[in-house]
Amino acid sequence: MKKIALIVAGGTGKRMKSEIPKQFLLLNNFPVLMHSIKKFSHFEKIIVVLPKTQFNYWDQLCRDWGFNKNHIIVEGGSTRFQSVKNGLAKIDEESIIAIHDGVRPLISKTLIDTLISKTKK
């Protein structure tokens, strides 16, 4: 069965009092969201949910960093629930879906694969 990652990254950085949303802050010289996407690079499809106001900024970051991991961008909603719903609406096939927070890049591929294997049982 196809594996799809739905990565939700709709934050604006308000609680951190940062002008830059935390998904775009640098971690080891790379934007945090890029680290998260890379962890799911072995999935057949990656959907990233962002506020529409951040689409152009994300596109520019991808060009600046030469980031070419294949992923689809979907507009987020006013709540996390709505953002996940918007992402799920782009899936039209039976699949195993991993929903992940884009600002949690420290998850290991081993843990991801373990969780996916548990869904198959």
Regions found by a protein language model. Name each.
Residues 11, 56, 60, 117:
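Charged/polar, solvent-exposed surface patches and flexible loops
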Residues 15, 58, 107-108:
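Active-site-proximal flexible loops/turns
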Residues 8-11, 27, 74-75, 81, ...:
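Short glycine/serine/threonine-biased micro-segments
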Residues 33-94:
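Conserved N-terminal catalytic core of the sugar/cofactor nucleotidyltransferase
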Residues 21, 46, 75, 99-103:
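Conserved short-loop catalytic and cofactor-binding motifs
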Residues 80-121:
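Conserved beta-loop-beta/alpha segment of the NTase-like Rossmann-fold superfamily
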Residues 2-55:
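N-terminal glycine-rich phosphate-binding loop and ensuing alpha1 helix
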Residues 20-23, 61-64, 88-89, 111-114:
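Short, glycine/charged-enriched secondary-structure capping and boundary segments
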